Design a protein with these regions (language model features):
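Intrinsically disordered, low-complexity regions enriched in serine/threonine
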Residues: 2-197
């Protein structure tokens, strides 16, 4: 869509996973590499761009873990997958159906959820996606109600900004994977519970 992207590396120390009462134990970190959309500062993180379980006892171990992440990350593939998103779209009726299924997913039995693609957006984030479908200055739907998957993905990542940092990166990756799951279904004309009855 012509949005300027900047390669970005970042991370946080996962204090939420620390046992503050124990003696010295490995420190935990989450590190990512991906792209920042300069239009809106949304992070675009792919599955191979996240290391969310780094446990280290030294700075050298942390450095080694980050270097491993940087080596395994395929930025060309990541860019290609995001570019592919712009070639597929949902009609307004498909979008409405999808939003309804997202809302239903949250209340399904766990056994039923396991049969669907996992979704980590919560109800308030889904509301944000719907609001921004109409009103986002950069990623709203077209006049006829259609929305391409790049725009939808950015609505997900925008809504994800309300997540606490301890699960922000994982939800960001889930948004990327969910969008690509939908694109695969559209491209291959295969069934998808979120898109079809």
């Amino acid at each position: 869509n012509g949005n300027k992207l900047a390669l970005t590396v970042g991370g946080v120390r996962a204090y939420n996973q620390e046992n503050l009462f124990s003696k010295k134990s490995p420190e935990k970190f989450k590190v990512f590499i991906g792209f920042k959309n300069m239009v809106c500062t949304n992070l675009c993180i792919s599955t191979d761009g996240l290391a969310d379980q780094i446990r280290v006892n030294s700075l050298n171990q942390l450095s080694e873990a980050v270097e491993n992440l940087l080596r395994q990350y395929d930025r060309i593939k990541h860019l290609g997958m995001m570019e592919r998103m712009s070639r597929f779209e949902l009609t307004q009726a498909q979008f409405a159906h999808f939003i309804g299924k997202l809302r239903m997913y949250q209340f399904m039995d766990k056994s039923e959820q396991r049969q669907c693609f996992p979704v980590s957006l919560n109800d308030s984030q889904i509301n944000t996606v719907v609001k921004n479908y109409y009103h986002d200055p950069n990623f709203s739907c077209k006049g006829d109600g259609t929305i391409n998957m790049w725009r939808l993905y950015n609505l997900f990542t925008e809504a994800n900004k309300s997540s606490y940092i301890d699960n922000n990166f994982e939800r960001n990756v889930n948004a990327y994977d969910l969008t690509n799951n939908l694109v695969n279904s559209l491209q291959n004309r295969t069934g998808n519970w979120f898109l079809h009855n």
